[in-house]
Amino acid sequence: MKNKIKIRLKSFDHRSLDQATKEIVSAVKRTFANINGPIPLPKKIGRFTVNRSPHVHKKSREQFEIRKHKRLLVIGDPNPAVVDALSKVDLAAGVDVVIELESGE
């Protein structure tokens, strides 16, 4: 039976996201576990168009965009030392972390 831990990281700032992935990868490599990644996933770009004036001048508009960057890390056949190392990693406040445990047969 082969287990995997999938870690998805999301952030609006790619620099803090890259720093978080480096910290996780170094923590996992210290436990001598097999790690694949960081795999860059497609970024989501949200664009918003708003009127500059609340009353008239419909043609005068302003556009904003927000980019959500994502990375994927896959840890193959983890041991308890990996889970302990992952729980001790301190990440930046702007990074969202989703951890999935996948058990294969």
Curated annotation (Swiss-Prot):
The answer, when asked if Ribonucleoprotein is one of the entry's keywords, is yes
Disulphide linkage map: none
Q: Name one GO molecular function term.
A: tRNA binding
Annotated Gene Ontology cellular components are: ribonucleoprotein complex; ribosome
Cite the Gene3D superfamilies for this sequence: Ribosomal protein S10 domain
Pfam families xrefs: Ribosomal_S10
Which UniProt keywords are present, listed alphabetically? Ribonucleoprotein, Ribosomal protein
Name one process (GO BP) from the record.
translation
Look up the domain of life of the source. Bacteria
The family database entries (PANTHER family) matched by this protein are listed as: 30S RIBOSOMAL PROTEIN S10 FAMILY MEMBER
Record's function text: Involved in the binding of tRNA to the ribosomes.
* Summary of subunit composition and partner proteins: Part of the 30S ribosomal subunit.
> What protein family is recorded?
Belongs to the universal ribosomal protein uS10 family.
* Protein name according to UniProt: Small ribosomal subunit protein uS10
Organism of origin: Rickettsia conorii (strain ATCC VR-613 / Malish 7)
Q: Which gene encodes it?
A: rpsJ
